[in-house]
C-alpha cells in the first residue's frame, strides 16, 4: 500500500486549507504534523496543531477529517520502520524545481517547529540526532539561484529530500522508541 493511496490529495488539501483560512501549504502542514509525531506528541497532536495554526480553536470537520487522514497515514508510515514514510511535497508535472525547493524548505521549517514543541531542548540533543537537527536547520535556510541548471538542481533536491526523510526517521526513532526492558535478572554473587 503506497502512502499516496491513503493521504489526502495534495491539491485537494491545499484547497481546503485555503478555504479554511489556514496560511500553510500541505507540505508545511505535513511537516508540522510529522514533527509533532517524531517528537512524541502522541494523542496531543490535534490540540498542538490547533494551538499553532488556529489560536487553539478546533478546525471544522471539513479540515479536521483530511488532517486526521494526514496524521494517521504519516504515523502509520513512520511506525512501519519508516519504509513508507515520504515527505508530502507537490509532485505535479507543472511544479517547477524551484517550487519544490520552496516546499521542501517549508516542510523542514514546520517539521522543526513541531519537533521543538514536543522536544523543547532540541539544542541539547547530541550525537547523530543532534547533527541531523543542525543539518535540518541549515537546509531550512538554503536558497537557490534561478540561473542554475534545473536538471542539476533537481538531482540535488532529490538527494536533500532523501536526507531530510532519513533525518526525520532518526528523530522519530530517537524521541519515540522506548528501549525495551531486558528480561535478564542479574543475581548478586553469593559469598560462601
UniProtKB/Swiss-Prot annotation:
Q: Which Pfam families match?
A: UPF0149 (PF03695)
The protein's superkingdom reads Bacteria
A Gene Ontology cellular-component term: cytosol
Question: Member of which family?
Answer: Belongs to the UPF0149 family.
Q: What protein name is recorded for this chain? A: UPF0149 protein ETA_28040
Q: Which organism is it from?
A: Erwinia tasmaniensis (strain DSM 17950 / CFBP 7177 / CIP 109463 / NCPPB 4357 / Et1/99)
Amino acid at each position: 500500500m503506497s502512502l499516496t493511496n491513503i493521504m489526502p490529495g495534495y491539491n485537494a488539501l491545499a484547497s481546503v486549507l485555503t478555504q479554511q483560512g489556514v496560511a500553510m501549504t500541505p507540505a508545511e502542514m505535513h511537516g508540522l504534523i510529522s514533527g509533532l509525531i517524531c517528537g512524541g506528541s502522541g494523542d496531543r497532536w490535534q490540540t498542538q496543531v490547533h494551538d499553532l495554526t488556529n489560536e487553539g480553536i478546533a478546525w471544522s470537520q471539513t479540515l479536521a477529517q483530511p488532517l486526521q487522514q494526514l496524521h494517521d497515514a504519516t504515523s502509520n508510515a513512520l511506525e512501519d520502520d519508516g519504509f513508507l514514510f515520504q515527505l508530502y511535497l507537490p509532485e505535479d508535472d507543472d511544479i517547477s524545481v524551484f517550487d519544490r525547493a520552496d516546499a521542501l524548505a517549508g516542510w523542514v521549517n514546520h517539521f522543526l517547529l513541531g519537533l521543538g514543541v514536543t522536544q523543547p531542548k532540541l539544542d541539547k540533543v547530541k550525537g547523530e540526532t543532534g547533527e541531523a537537527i543542525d543539518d535540518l536547520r541549515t537546509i531550512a535556510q538554503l536558497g537557490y539561484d534561478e540561473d542554475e541548471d534545473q536538471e542539476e538542481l533537481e538531482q540535488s533536491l532529490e538527494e536533500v529530500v532523501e536526507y531530510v526523510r532519513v533525518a526525520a526517521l532518526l528523530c522519530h526513532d530517537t524521541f519515540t522508541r522506548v528501549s525495551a526492558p531486558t528480561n535478564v535478572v542479574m543475581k548478586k554473587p553469593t559469598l560462601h
